Amino acid sequence: MLMPFEIMETIKMIQEENLDIRTITMGISLRDCASSNSKETRDKIYNKITRLAANLVKVGEDIEKEFGIPIVNKRISVTPISLVAESSDEENYIKFAETLDKAADAVGVNFIGGFSALVQKGYTIGDRRLIASIPEALSSTKKVCSSVNVASTKAGINMDAVREMGHVIKKAAELSADSGGLACAKLVVFANVPEDNPFMAGAFHGVGEPECVINVGVSGPGVVKSALEKVRGADFETVSETIKKTAFKITRMGQLVAREASRRLGVAFGIVDLSLAPTPTIGDSVAHILEEMGLEKCGTHGTTAALALLNDAVKKGGTMASSSVGGLSGAFIPVSEDAGMIDAVKAGALSIEKLEAMTCVCSVGLDMIVVPGDTSEETISAIIADEAAIGVINNKTTAVRIIPAPGKKVGDIVEFGGLLGSGPVMKVSNFSSRDFINRGGRIPAPLNSLRN
């Protein structure tokens, strides 16, 4: 039986503490669309997406109205296009990206993910074609998102792919220079990528997934901060317990929406992603949660420990609320999308090096990092390599979403707008990693990959 105080608590979470469902993401398998004729393949892709996702936006809006729960985004993820397009006669896959963009427009979703390649152990022909197409594909489309998995604990790190992604990111930034390198905000480089992630820009529909599935990503940093304000000065066991209870409530709401959406759309329910996803809105910041624990500024000594506590407690609370937890599930630390992170960078408290340490204990990695436009390809590749190493050795997902903003220098601010926010340009090392990156080859899998 629902108690009146629980109802009022939920209303307060939504109205005052920015609780929302960040995304309902429909995953669609395109494996049956592959053919040797590229136009036929693209027609099949468009028809299948528009058929299965025809009611996705309407159902999301109906649930939002009926339940009173804000649903910020409706999105689609598809089978990695490098797999679907590989048997076609196309030399580059830009037209496939345009087809995805057209389909996303037709059904009214915010983003579509899956312009992706999995190259942790090496390239196929389709992988090479897709990766070469990324800069132009992302700069010429509005809703298409791309991801490349360059490493895994089982395979090690494909350093040839790491090197190439440095070039791809620089090229994407140049082609979208008029928007501050916005194309790079739609590109993520992963290690140990999950196949059921509902969040962009890294979402794609894995080959082990069903024909069609609904995955939901929750949010709620403001709710967690508000809960911690009530136990200010208490010990860490109390802090952890408070976060766990709050994460339970947030996840329950996500599970409710996910099951209802899958029922109404007539497709399978997949997972709830527990990730605390911040926005540039004041009161919706992961950094402010860490500061509520007692840090003067996010990035000071103790930040990594505070984030580890937060991430662990969120998972413990969330897994008690749902038996279908997946995706990334933790705490996101995207600099440009988090008001507290932005302030910390401006104050000089938060550096790329500290963010890298934080990624050892949180959900993803170096996310929405803006660096000077003259940052070299090799430096970007080296940043990716460092992050991939953390993921591979620790058997966790890590990622890099980095924007070398054309014409910008350290201290400048780049405005992206919307959920992407604004990013202060951060300093990178002045010393070169060129000779290291140009070695190429593959960093072998670690000993802890042998688990049988």
Swiss-Prot record:
This is UPF0210 protein Cthe_0410. It holds the Pfam family DUF711. Homodimer. Disulfide bonds: none annotated. InterPro entries: UPF0210. SUPFAM superfamilies: PFL-like glycyl radical enzymes. Belongs to the UPF0210 family. NCBIfam families: PRK05313.1.
